[in-house]
Structure formats: structure tokens, C-alpha cells
């Protein structure tokens, strides 16, 4: 059992709550704002202390690159933890892995499925329906990297701020969702990319799913 200070416990709980509510960890700036720190640097110092104690892992260069680790207390939550595929003894779900998606066909069409993974249900904030192979770095600062496997639950509607898989005409993309009236913005988590704006009155758009977890295979 790792011994944490009261402040470290507070930050760890904040990370867990953010992961549970939104599917992803908070940024340093969000931690600082929530806990009344003067700067994101103060949050970074506490995160580094948590990492040294083995409570979290930090991915350098990403604002949301925080992963929860097993602290030996049975409270190991996901998403936010990126990990290797689990031991066969823990496998409970069989999830299709979707690769490239052809225009005009359902995302779970047989020709899109590259493989099937058996994974532990407890790894996800909600039961996923499929895994999507991430392509590109537009969601880098949310800790979602090229080649990662995004666990996705099929949905018809989403809340502002959630990370979704959306279909825009012939393209499928992973972005943060924001809707106002008939206008939708699909927001990247990388300043090198521009938001995608959708007018439901004119543009072809569909929600394919909600991100509920993230897996990374280690070689």
C-alpha cells in the first residue's frame, strides 16, 4: 500500500473522478484551477511526486498523459491507464478491432475488422462494443497516440466535452465533441490541428461511438 499525503490523495482522487466522468485524465492547468494552485507548475510537482511513489505514470510531452497504476488497493480504474493486453486468465470481453473504414459502410462491417481481442471488462468506464485503431496525432494532448487502441461504446448522442468517434461523409475521426444548436465542433487535442465544424443542416454527420478506454500494446 502506497502512503500518500493528504494533498496527493486529493489530486489522485481528482484524476480518478475526471477519468470516470469524461474518460480521460485532467490537464495540469485543470488540476491547478480545481485545487486553487497559482500555476500548472505546482500541479506538475505533485504529479511528479505521485509518479515517484508509483501511483501514476506520466507520458512526457502530453498535457493529459497521466496513467493510473495499481496501488495494491483494488481500486485500479480505466480509462486513462494505458497498458498491455491482459493475461488470458482475466479475459472477459471479445472485442473486434476496427482498422480503416470504407466510405458508406457500417463501422463494424466485416471487412473493417482486422482482429479480435479478448480483454478484461473491468478495464473500461463502460462496456465497449469495439476497439478502433487510432491514426494520427490530433488527440496527442489527451494521451491518445497514433497506433493506440481506443475502446468505443456505440451511441447516438453525446455530451459536450466527451471524446467521440464521428463519421463525416467518407471520413471517421476521433475528436472532442461540442454542440450548439445545429452546429457541432469536433475539437482536436493538439494545437497543430484545426477544429472541424459541422452544420447539421447541410453536412453529413453521424456519431459512431463514445471513447470509454484506451489500450496500448507494448512490444
Swiss-Prot record:
GO terms for molecular function: DNA binding; serine-type endopeptidase activity. Gene3D superfamilies: Umud Fragment, subunit A, Winged helix-like DNA-binding domain superfamily/Winged helix DNA-binding domain. The keyword NADP does not apply. It holds the Pfam family LexA_DNA_bind. Its EC number is 3.4.21.88. The record marks 103-104 as: Cleavage. Residues 28-48 bind DNA. GO terms for biological process: DNA repair; DNA replication; negative regulation of DNA-templated transcription; proteolysis; SOS response. It catalyses: Hydrolysis of Ala-|-Gly bond in repressor LexA. The active site is at residues 138, 175. Keywords: Autocatalytic cleavage, DNA damage, DNA repair, DNA replication, DNA-binding, Hydrolase, Repressor, SOS response, Transcription, Transcription regulation. InterPro entries: LexA, LexA-like, LexA/Signal_pep-like_sf, LexA_DNA-bd_dom, LexA_repressor, Peptidase_S24_LexA, Peptidase_S24_S26A/B/C, WH-like_DNA-bd_sf. Represses a number of genes involved in the response to DNA damage (SOS response), including recA and lexA. In the presence of single-stranded DNA, RecA interacts with LexA causing an autocatalytic cleavage which disrupts the DNA-binding part of LexA, leading to derepression of the SOS regulon and eventually DNA repair. Homodimer. Belongs to the peptidase S24 family. PANTHER family: LEXA REPRESSOR, LEXA REPRESSOR-RELATED. This is LexA repressor. The gene is lexA.
Amino acid at each position: 500500500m502506497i502512503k500518500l499525503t493528504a494533498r496527493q490523495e486529493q489530486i489522485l482522487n481528482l484524476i480518478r473522478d475526471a477519468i470516470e466522468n469524461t474518460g480521460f485524465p485532467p490537464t495540469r492547468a485543470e488540476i491547478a484551477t480545481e485545487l486553487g494552485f497559482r500555476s500548472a507548475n505546482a500541479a506538475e510537482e505533485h504529479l511528479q511526486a505521485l509518479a515517484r511513489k508509483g501511483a501514476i505514470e506520466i507520458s512526457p510531452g502530453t498535457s493529459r498523459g497521466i496513467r493510473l497504476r495499481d496501488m495494491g488497493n483494488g481500486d485500479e480504474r480505466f480509462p486513462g491507464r494505458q497498458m498491455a493486453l491482459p493475461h488470458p486468465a482475466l479475459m472477459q470481453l471479445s472485442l473486434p478491432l476496427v482498422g480503416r473504414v470504407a466510405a458508406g459502410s457500417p463501422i463494424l462491417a466485416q471487412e473493417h475488422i482486422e482482429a479480435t481481442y479478448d480483454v478484461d471488462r473491468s478495464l473500461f468506464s463502460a462496456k465497449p462494443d469495439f476497439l478502433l485503431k487510432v491514426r494520427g496525432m490530433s488527440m496527442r494532448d489527451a494521451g491518445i497516440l497514433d497506433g493506440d487502441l481506443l475502446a468505443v461504446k456505440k451511441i447516438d448522442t453525446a455530451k459536450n466535452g466527451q471524446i467521440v468517434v464521428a463519421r463525416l461523409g467518407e471520413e471517421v475521426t476521433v475528436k472532442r465533441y461540442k454542440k450548439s444548436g445545429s452546429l457541432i465542433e469536433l475539437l482536436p487535442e493538439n494545437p497543430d490541428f484545426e477544429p472541424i465544424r459541422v452544420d447539421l443542416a447541410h453536412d453529413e454527420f453521424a456519431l459512431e461511438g463514445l471513447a470509454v478506454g484506451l489500450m496500448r500494446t507494448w512490444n
